[in-house]
Amino acid sequence: MEQRSKCLDEKIPYRLALSATLERHGDSAGTEKLFNYFKNKCIEYSLKDAIENDMLVRYYYHPVVVSFESEELNDYLELTKKIGKLILGNKKKEISDQAKMLLIKRARLVAAARQKVDALVDEMKDYMEENHILVYCGATTMKDVDYKEGKPLEEEKRQIDIVMKRLGLELNMKVAKFTSEEDAQKREILKREFDEGESIQALIAIRCLDEGVNIPSIRKAFILASSTNPKEYIQRRGRVLRKCPGKKYADIYDFIMSPIPLDRVDSYNESIVKMSASLVKREIERMKDFAALAENSSEADEIIYELMDKYQINYLDEEEFYE
């Protein structure tokens, strides 16, 4: 933001900004600079306004809770401890390059949790004959379902490849990849075939909803890797809700990470629960945001209450390990 803030020329008397998400995630100073420069909002048109004015379709929100396997949980806790030491040991509370690398590594671990693909397959069994489905994967690698300890690193595959394999071979669905690897011409062909709903039932994608790609025929979205950055998940949701002939509503399946299986949280000591709760809090914030405008908000509310109860979120100290 420091370099870009130099573009905010104070000599310019007339200023107008248009943004879907003006607040900068994790950058309160940058957000303050923007508001100070452009001053008060003159017009605000919210997602709620767009839905109520029939500019976007209504939607149903379905949180799907998944957890780490034992090895993954141990890795997550170890990374969280290291991050905490690096940040809390810095008197300026600045995030060092080393801490940033660990944060990225931890985020990838969350995105690639093996249970997510298992849960996706279970959910998708109800829609094996349907079409206009989007599966949103993380740009990350994960161990294949056939992985065995001691095998070489090439056994680790991209999450998208594992999803393609399991939906295509295990459920016999007609699926296609939609990523930055496909050129513009190929993407247009995929979009057309997806719209027609005959040769492609589901697009398995990475980042396509962050790049301005317009696929309004999406009726069901399964989000395996959801950002904690409101800017990103607000944009993704808005694109899923775009109108299309015959599309009355959309379904959004959001895979929520509870580091510890909910039925086992009580068996872990307080320090482990507390370290895990910082991630759960961020997941809850996203769930609240999605549920607020959903047609079935009570479905998410029940899961939110259970997560808060299990992780004692009302009673924990405000101090958290950083995102």
Language-model regions: role of each:
Residues 12-17, 131-132, 198-202:
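Loop/turn-to-beta-strand initiation segments
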